[in-house]
Amino acid sequence: MGFLRRVGAYGVLWDGDRVLVVRDGVEGEFPGVWRLPGGAIAHAEHPERAVVRAVAEQTELTVAAGRLRAVVADVTSHPEGVSVHTDRLFFELVQRDDRLGAASLGDRLVADGSLGDGPVADGLLVDAGGGSVDRVAWLTLAEAAGLSLTPFTAEMLGLPVTPLPPGTHRPDQSFPPPHPDRRLRFGAYGLVTDPAGRILLTQIANGYPGAGLWHLPGGGTDHGEQPTTGLLRELVEEGGQLGRVVELLGVDNLHNPAALGPEGRALDWHGVRVIYRVLVDVPTDAVVTESAGGSTARAGWFTRAEAVDLPLSDIAALAIGQSGR
């Protein structure tokens, strides 16, 4: 079986009691199904920029990305022998104008406001998004509940989640073949503390990018793994600690066009790294439990004053710096 990974960025935008949703067209990921606006991130693209771009393309609205609200993963299997894992990031959006869409879309408003497969809503646009999206609407939750929604959209809106029929997802159009020298890596990392306020850090082993730097516990998630599950697994492997996730802090974007790692040749790396706050209620001595030859050389507990004097990775410096504000 072939395994594909994908990262998408989506937005939740409210206008009073109405939320902005789009329906995928024939070239979309879920043809005929309604979802939150957004889509796949491009190589090296920050998820915040990706959601702003996708919303503009699909709705002609100008928005800004606000707080990262949630990150979830889903897996779809296909008869062609392909399993697609998608990590989806959901941002709260702020509208930069007071229009549903650009004035040029006025002649595309549906005359009677009918959605065809559900309730009636005003301000409906059709034929948006260049074929990937064919309808755009502001809907109340009651109206949205009467439509066919992607599971991730229903979950984000607090509505009942209904599995889609087999064959609804179309990865052959949505997922081009991977570039031989490009890598996309989705990872979950933790600003891990104990009740005394100490911070757990891990040192990157030789042979890996950033060798010798002190890093946040965490790493790439496995196929089919939720981000928080992967983070807590890595916490055990890299630091020997049992923790609990208490807060989603944000997302960091890494692009290194010539990263040299265990592969032995320079690769164009794009890393999407979500950061959580993790509490270890009963800390123990930090011990690396993963097999020898892994990316972690050692781990340790540090006060914040000690941590800021260490050679830190970019993401560790970012998280520790923000925690002290």
Features from the language model and the residues they span:
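Conserved Nudix-box catalytic region and its N-terminal flanking loop in Nudix hydrolases
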Residues: 18-58, 198-241
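A generic structural micro-feature
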Residues: 3, 33, 81-87, 130-133, ...
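Acidic, metal-coordinating catalytic segment for phosphate/diphosphate chemistry
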Residues: 1-12, 158-191, 204, 266
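NUDIX/MutT-family hydrolases
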Residues: 103-113, 117-161, 286-322
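A short coil-to-beta-strand element that immediately follows conserved catalytic motifs
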Residues: 62-71, 242-251
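A structural signal for short, well-ordered beta-strand segments
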Residues: 11, 68, 89-93, 188-190, ...
